[in-house]
Amino acid sequence: MNIKILVATHKQYWMPEDPVYMPIHVGREGKVDIGYTGDHTGDNISSKNANYCELTGLYWAWKNLDADYIGLVHYRRYFTRKEVRSVEDKKNQILTGAEWEKLLSQYPVVVADKRKYYIESNRSHYNNAHHSDGLDVAEQIIAERYPEYSAAFTKVCNRTWAHMFNMFVMRRDLFDQYCEWMFSIL
């Protein structure tokens, strides 16, 4: 089972040594080399990093990476065996390649735990943390291109919980479908 989990980063930082983890320098176009694979080679959208953040690395993986399973984590956020707070404790709890193989033999997609927001909806959380224009435009594009998803979009926006942080590992065919859909909206 060939698993590659991108570790999105914009700076040098501690990285897991397990070969399933692949540090990727997101927004690498025009930046100094920090020693990681850059998202600026092959078919890429690295120059859009200011607006797309880690999605430039995800796009790069979609177009250039050969793997049976592809995932995304962040240089300070990983899937761990148990919840831990300190960086040092987290390093010892990050899932290994062997643990990923076992998990992915049972589930085609793994996402981050559900996070609950008791005092606000996903829409209000997004609007408070980001520019509301982006969500409004995405909603409009979904209504135009994928009207069958409009009700689900509204439902998710009105919820007070979500699987946050853009972290997942997916079987390649599902990853391809996800990227095809998402990047057609962005």
Q: What residue ranges belong to the model's regions?
A:
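ER/Golgi luminal nucleotide-sugar-dependent glycosyltransferases, focusing on the catalytic module
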Residues: 1-186
